[in-house]
Design a protein with these regions (language model features):
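Caspase-like (clan CD) cysteine peptidase catalytic core
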Residues: 25, 69-96, 100-158
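N-terminal secretory signal peptides that target proteins for export/translocation
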Residues: 1-3
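Active-site-proximal C-terminal subdomain of hydrolase catalytic domains
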Residues: 45, 49-50, 56, 66, ...
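Short glycine-/polar-rich loops that comprise or flank the Walker A/P-loop
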Residues: 24-26, 61, 138-140, 179-181
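Second-shell loop/turn segments in exported
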Residues: 35-43, 62-68, 115-121, 192
Length: 192
């Protein structure tokens, strides 16, 4: 597990008062996508997700863990998470894998992703939708994106000529955190 994760988990443990003393309801969705069908495999996301899930369980989170999820599986766990977040005091979302921005909107990539044109983005998970799901938690909402942002599918889309010039940007777009929400990126917005 990299330094970024260790720092995030240490801060999270301090913030939440590590251990069983608190009676808060805590839920987390942890996704690690690395076994991409159409591009090179990323070796770390699955291990990172499992490490984060274990640390969150030690902090009394109910964890929904998904690794190497396709489109339908990502939708299923996101719906399950939204329902759990609505009943939680604290909700956290952690993602490791490919992500990209298009027209200022951030997307998470399922392992069965194809990106032949802009219409295919409907099959990706919008980060804004996850943030909306997080907002249902009563007290604290945490979004951690440790994504590989040098997205090879975005390059395919640019080369295909089936997108407007400049609509696929570097890295992820900057996000404003709603009140009571912590958003953490592994790099600055717009960087890979």
């Amino acid at each position: 597990m990299g330094t970024f994760f260790r720092v995030c988990l240490a801060l999270l443990a301090c913030w939440l008062g590590y251990g069983p003393a608190r009676a808060e309801t805590r839920v987390a969705l942890v996704i690690g996508n690395g076994a991409y069908a159409n591009k090179a495999v990323l070796p770390n996301p699955t291990n990172d997700a499992e490490d984060v899930a274990a640390a969150l369980r030690r902090s009394n989170f109910e964890v929904i863990l998904g690794t190497n999820l396709g489109q339908s599986q990502m939708q299923e766990v996101a719906i399950r998470f939204a329902r759990a977040a609505a009943k939680a005091d604290v909700a956290m979302f952690y993602y490791s894998g490919h992500a990209m921005q298009h027209n200022g909107v951030n997307y998470l990539m399922p392992v069965d992703a194809r990106l032949d044109d802009e219409a295919d983005l409907k099959r990706f998970t919008r980060v804004d939708d996850i943030v909306s799901d997080l907002q249902q938690a009563k007290n604290l909402r945490i979004l951690v994106l440790d994504s590989c942002r040098d997205n090879p599918l975005a390059e395919d889309l640019k080369r295909s000529g089936r997108t407007r010039s400049g609509s696929v940007g570097r890295g992820l777009s900057k996000m404003e955190a709603p009140l009571g929400t912590i958003i953490s990126f592994s790099t600055q917005a717009g960087r890979t």
